[in-house]
Amino acid sequence: MELTHFDEEGRARMVDVSAKAETTRVATARGKVEMQAETLERIRSGQIAKGDVLAVAQVAGIMAAKQTSNVIPMCHPLAITGAKLNFEIVPPGTIEIEGIVKVTGKTGVEMEALTAVSVAALTIYDMCKAIDKTMVISDIRLMEKTGGKSGHFIREDHLKSTT
């Protein structure tokens, strides 16, 4: 498989997508934050001094999706048409994060979905670190993507979780 972010001399470049067709593209990413059970209970009950952790993480993730090209060097700036973050509380101490990003464009939104989940997780960590420095952010991964020349990708464990 060819790495397209390098030219013939091995120098970095942003891929030219001008000849690609505009299609609807959707990407779903997931990750999780593991914490002490007491921390999760304080998030659930609104007992975190910095505010509503999941509401702030949701906004942070959406904002991050829109800014992905500013932090990932070879990412194209995209006019995202939709971004959504979902959180699932899994006792005793896990928050699972799902990010779904959509665009009609010439390149996919995988990096935007991954960035949304990553920043949402980092926001949860930031807002709770005063009471729990043992939190672990993990398993950030692309679950599914549709649209574009490379077609439909679906991670096997995502297929199992949606059936």
Swiss-Prot record:
Keyword Lyase: yes
Keywords: Lyase, Molybdenum cofactor biosynthesis
Catalysis: reaction(s): (8S)-3',8-cyclo-7,8-dihydroguanosine 5'-triphosphate = cyclic pyranopterin phosphate + diphosphate
Enzyme class, spelled out: lyase
Top-level taxon in the UniProt lineage: Bacteria
GO BP annotations listed: Mo-molybdopterin cofactor biosynthetic process
Binding site for substrate: 74-76, 111-112
Residue positions of the active site: 126
Keyword presence, Transcription regulation: no
Biochemical pathway: Cofactor biosynthesis; molybdopterin biosynthesis
Gene3D superfamilies linked to this entry: Molybdopterin cofactor biosynthesis C (MoaC) domain
Pfam families, sorted: MoaC
E.C. designation(s): 4.6.1.17
Entry GO MF terms: cyclic pyranopterin monophosphate synthase activity
Function, as annotated: Catalyzes the conversion of (8S)-3',8-cyclo-7,8-dihydroguanosine 5'-triphosphate to cyclic pyranopterin monophosphate (cPMP).
Family note: Belongs to the MoaC family.
Oligomeric and partner information: Homohexamer; trimer of dimers.
Name assigned to this protein: Cyclic pyranopterin monophosphate synthase
